[in-house]
């Protein structure tokens, strides 16, 4: 019997070590090394794609025909946008996200909308009966999508060879294993080798493959982090399970922009595309309520208006509480320090709670002005006019710094009927405001924004 060799591999970056180490010297992450046992006789073997093809020959650059090949229309405007206009032939796409966020639902309802293509759906997690029940819940239309429950990579290639599909779905890559690797499914070695073999198959046969990958809730599993270096496109499906909205982001895309964003609404019968997220994210009944400010934000390349809510109250306990949902807590603490140092509001003995309505997580610095405005509104118990929105980054000296794509932000606010928008004064340079129906209020400092909002 061959002697087994133990290797410790970082589940975050793939760095290996003959012994366990607490901190990875390559990526700097702690407690990410896991033990992998490999056999010497198979350690250098790689799984083959199972498709016989001719050996590639070097050619000159001018001999290569680079005609634009039509992409596969997935009949999903949001997914097509994030992919860059559709699915590229021969591409390997990874859709990652936390368990239960809706990855399988997104992919299954997408393939059910493509009757003109022959699709093979490989499931390693659910039975065919479970998939049938899920499909009936998503749509009543019939589909010729082929479904097979299989976890062996070699058997999957046999099914592909027999069916010759136009598109292959594998749900999920963590459940697939190859016989050439003596390791359990979902391990770093299995995930890496199986995905590399699938990539080779996709390129050799010009067949697009969509992989679904899980991210552990603790973030300790290898999963999509390792796959990012292998696949062509990485899509991140994120959101809070307690809220209805889901966001599809492009993390890596060799065939399109990574600035695109798709927004969905989770319903009982599946995911619904949200073409105008601003109308859903804004509350319709906050008249007379303090602590509410509307921000014109941009996620990816899409502008939309979001509702920033703040609650400021006297600290009941010894230490004041600070809490932020959907916004960086450290940045909120910085903005509170700016309010106290530059504007003169004493909030050191106040509890401050901040919430981005709708369960969204926003990283756009242009919502700084709305965060400060909502906090001031709650602290003074004074309402901000409902037809007023704002966009601006706040600096440490209390200045309102310019933001990008200001025309798109103003246009979104004007489209939804807002009458006023506060913007950085620097953004006003070179802007033609004569055709705008919305009133532009330029501000340079937080004090000016305070006077414009509260008099």
Question: Which stretches of residues belong to each language-model region?
Answer:
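Divalent metal-dependent catalytic cores for phosphoryl transfer on phosphate-bearing substrates
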Residues: 128
